[in-house]
């Protein structure tokens, strides 16, 4: 008998003896175990969550922090979602502990009370099992040029050519995204892509874009442009793939495009590792070709990311780069979906879907860490303004005998009440900031140690939600009128003043704050429902709190009025973190009409805007159009999916939560006929 035969006989003998003993066990015999799994409340709640998820119509209707960046239900999402309540409890316990350490005379449990009373909301506190993680970032890619992703724990060294750049770039996106709760902006992506194009084909490659570089036996000859587009396809389709490290969501990626003055202001003194400087002509060509390619590619597959922003400088009554301005309007005419950021100075960069980041520096000197791109929000806490206003009213005004009518004499009392809450939130942010530094010092935030981002350059953000409803409760109309304008100015300027007052850049761990109208994709629904359930006033004409200065379901507010309401008389210099003006249209306009709108926006100080026209896709033949249709013009099918933005990124409406799908039906999509856009 061989050793193999002997082992085989021994195996079956042991199994046979075990099964014989097992067979002698009576079915009704009581077997003692250390755990009563069946009656364990923790286990029962988790199983109940799984059952709810299985029965839900889509992922957004079953998850803790729903968003539309998920395309189907699967076990990977369950794995990410099932422990979110536990993550939240851990996060809150850590913040309370740090509050006690930093502020021994402050009642740290007030943090829990403010959260559970829905006065404030801590964004993405459930996203990480480690409970503490930064929110979003705009990175510098310079460390990527020097060391690849080794500093992130990867194996890839610095890229040497265009092919390796594209591959390692995708790896970098997934590696960094896995360590942030929100978006990762790579504003230098096309700048560095252009750098490697020059290495591949020479400095004048863009002038020879139709030059044939390969003649395959089977297939069309490949030109420089075709090869470039192939690399873009690799990058874009890769970053749109779901990632296990993000709960089966794709990475939330933002790209920026620059006009010439913005490029010169941001990168005028920038040098690549080999001592060369970027030039405007080649980058401009790459930017335009990429935008045209990406817009056309969305007729093949509706791609969600990157979220794109074009920056335009407007000064002395005109756009300084007229060529880029004209190109932007042409792209809008052709159905391209992107944001436009208008500024009169190169002191800020809009890198997320609504956030205006004032840059701490524009110096590009990697050795001392002064990288102007590095910014973002490391923590976001949002105020439920509608509830806060009503709590103030109940305390200060409800006992008045005469009928209450809000006027400017009440602002002192209101701002005093709101300031007390703001002051507490600074403490909460301070505690969270120190917890982030604890993670940083323990080596758990490698993106920072590797130099992609500096924790001291990121903001602690105070968000606002429920602005419209707060104003309506006080008897105001949310249209362009002096009373509502003053209300916005008073509220926003209070936050800005307090942000400056509490700013600390002298300590080792900097505290810098900003305020913004947060997107509130799921929070807007939550706050509305919380307030309604708790007996606070909520309007009947909507089912959520929107993130705009105007009400997106108000048919009486025109496109130009919406622009003014996101301009200098409402936001201006008062709201230091910004807000995005979403203009919903029923069809795309002409380039001339878009020029009129952008010019009007620039003159009225509306810094950040975009246009939303629903896209449509036939379920049967796959035909895609950049405007809605009920019947497919190609095959005649009526099985149609619509795509639009909730706030920042383009997704299938069927993937939205039920509440957001309902809200979509109430949006006013403006119909504009004439070249001259009237009120």
Ranges and model annotations:
Residues 2-3, 8:
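N-terminal amphipathic/hydrophobic targeting modules at extreme N-termini
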Residues 3, 14-15:
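Short hydrophobic transmembrane-like helices used for membrane targeting/insertion
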Residues 22, 27-456, 477, 481-642:
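Conserved catalytic cores of very large enzyme subunits
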Residues 191, 460-473, 493, 645:
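Contiguous, well-ordered alpha-helical segments that form the cores/surfaces of helical PPI scaffolds
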Residues 226, 473, 668:
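Metallocofactor- and cofactor-centric catalytic cores in central/energy metabolism, strongly enriched
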Residues 455-456, 460-463, 653, 661:
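Core of folded catalytic or high-affinity ligand/protein-binding domains
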Residues 627-679:
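Long insertion/accessory domains within large nucleic-acid-processing enzymes
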């Amino acid at each position: 008998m061989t050793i193999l035969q002997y082992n085989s006989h021994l195996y079956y003998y042991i199994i046979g003896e075990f099964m014989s003993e097992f067979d002698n066990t009576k079915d009704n015999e009581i077997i003692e175990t250390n755990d009563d799994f069946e009656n364990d409340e923790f286990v029962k709640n988790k199983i109940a969550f799984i059952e709810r998820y299985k029965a839900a119509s889509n992922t957004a209707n079953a998850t803790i922090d729903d968003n539309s960046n998920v395309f189907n239900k699967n076990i990977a999402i369950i794995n990410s979602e099932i422990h979110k309540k536990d993550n939240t409890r851990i996060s809150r316990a850590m913040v309370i502990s740090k509050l006690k350490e930093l502020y021994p005379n402050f009642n740290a449990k007030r943090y829990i009370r403010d959260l559970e009373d829905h006065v404030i909301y801590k964004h993405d506190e459930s996203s990480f099992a480690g409970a503490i993680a930064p929110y979003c970032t705009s990175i510098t890619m310079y460390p990527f040029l020097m060391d690849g992703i080794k500093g992130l724990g990867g194996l890839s060294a610095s890229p040497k050519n265009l092919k390796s750049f594209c591959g390692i770039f995708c790896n970098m996106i997934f590696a960094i995204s896995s360590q942030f709760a929100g978006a990762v902006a790579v504003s230098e992506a096309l700048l560095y892509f252009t750098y490697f194009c020059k290495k591949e084909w020479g400095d004048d490659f863009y002038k020879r874009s139709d030059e044939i570089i390969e003649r395959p036996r089977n297939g069309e000859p490949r030109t420089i442009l075709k090869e470039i587009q192939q690399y873009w396809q690799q990058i874009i389709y890769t970053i749109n793939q779901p990632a296990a490290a993000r709960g089966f969501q794709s990475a939330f990626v933002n790209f920026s495009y620059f006009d010439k003055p913005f490029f010169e202001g941001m990168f005028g003194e920038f040098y690549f590792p080999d001592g060369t400087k970027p030039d405007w002509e080649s980058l401009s060509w790459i930017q335009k070709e990429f935008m045209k390619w990406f817009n056309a590619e969305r007729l093949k597959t509706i791609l969600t990311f990157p979220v794109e922003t074009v920056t335009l400088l407007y000064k002395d009554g005109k756009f300084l780069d007229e060529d880029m301005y004209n190109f932007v309007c042409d792209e809008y005419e052709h159905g391209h979906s992107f944001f436009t950021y208008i500024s009169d100075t190169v002191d800020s960069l809009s890198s997320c879907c609504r956030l205006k980041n004032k840059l701490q520096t524009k110096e590009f000197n990697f050795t001392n860490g002064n990288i102007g791109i590095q910014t973002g929000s490391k923590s976001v806490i949002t105020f439920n303004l509608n509830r806060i206003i009503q709590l103030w009213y109940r305390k200060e005004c409800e006992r008045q005998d005469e009928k209450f009518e809000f006027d400017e004499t009440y602002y002192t009392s209101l701002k005093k009440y709101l300031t007390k809450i703001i002051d507490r939130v600074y403490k909460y942010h301070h505690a969270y900031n120190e917890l982030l530094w604890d993670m940083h010092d323990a080596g758990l935030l490698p993106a920072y140690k590797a130099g992609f981002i500096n924790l001291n350059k990121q903001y602690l953000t105070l968000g606002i939600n429920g602005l419209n409803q707060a104003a309506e409760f006080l008897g105001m109309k949310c249209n362009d009128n002096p009373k509502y304008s003053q209300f916005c100015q008073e509220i926003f300027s209070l936050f800005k003043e307090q942000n400056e007052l509490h700013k600390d850049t002298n300590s080792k761990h900097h505290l810098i704050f900003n305020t913004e109208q947060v997107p509130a994709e799921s929070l807007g629904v939550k706050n509305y429902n919380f307030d309604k359930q708790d007996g606070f006033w909520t309007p009947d004409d909507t089912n959520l709190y929107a993130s705009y200065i105007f009400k997106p379901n108000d048919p009486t507010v025109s496109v130009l009025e919406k622009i003014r309401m996101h301009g200098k008389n409402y936001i201006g210099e008062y709201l230091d973190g910004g807000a995005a003006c979403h203009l919903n249209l029923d069809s795309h306009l002409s380039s001339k009409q878009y020029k009129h709108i952008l010019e009007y926006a620039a003159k009225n100080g509306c810094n950040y805007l975009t246009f939303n026209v629903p896209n449509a896709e036939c379920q049967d033949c796959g035909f895609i159009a950049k405007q809605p249709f009920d019947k497919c013009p190609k095959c005649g099918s009526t099985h149609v999916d619509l795509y639009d933005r909730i706030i920042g990124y383009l997704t299938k409406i069927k993937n939205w939560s039920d509440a957001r799908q309902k809200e979509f039906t109430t949006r006013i999509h403006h119909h504009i006929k004439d070249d001259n856009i009237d009120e």
